[in-house]
From Swiss-Prot:
Keywords: Ribonucleoprotein, Ribosomal protein, RNA-binding, rRNA-binding. The keyword rRNA-binding applies. Belongs to the bacterial ribosomal protein bS20 family. This is Small ribosomal subunit protein bS20. InterPro entries: Ribosomal_bS20, Ribosomal_bS20_sf. It comes from the Bacteria. One of its GO terms (biological process) is translation. GO terms for molecular function: small ribosomal subunit rRNA binding; structural constituent of ribosome.
């Protein structure tokens, strides 16, 4: 346990940021699952709206440093391939 006042404050800040990051990562997983469900149901319109939501959320998470920008790009690319296969 930290004894220095600034170290104690850093522990509180880290806990807060960790919770926020967990919430955002959990929301990302939920958005991806919604897209996957729409894709499995072969629902084109719902898949398009879900993809837009996922894409925006991934970009925001990458810009805030919660996930790496390459991971966001890879996820978006793979989901876009699925969406395009549904349209074809």
């Amino acid at each position: 346990m930290a004894n220095i006042k600034s170290a104690k404050k850093r522990i509180k800040v880290i806990e807060t940021k960790t919770l926020r990051n967990k919430m955002i990562k959990s929301a990302l997983k939920t958005y991806i699952k919604k897209f996957e469900a729409a894709f499995e149901a072969k629902n084109v319109e719902e898949s398009k709206t879900a993809f837009a939501t996922v894409s925006k959320a991934l970009d925001m998470a990458a810009s805030k440093g919660i996930i790496h920008k390459n991971k966001a790009a890879r996820k978006k690319s793979r989901l876009a391939l699925k969406l395009n296969s549904l349209n074809a």
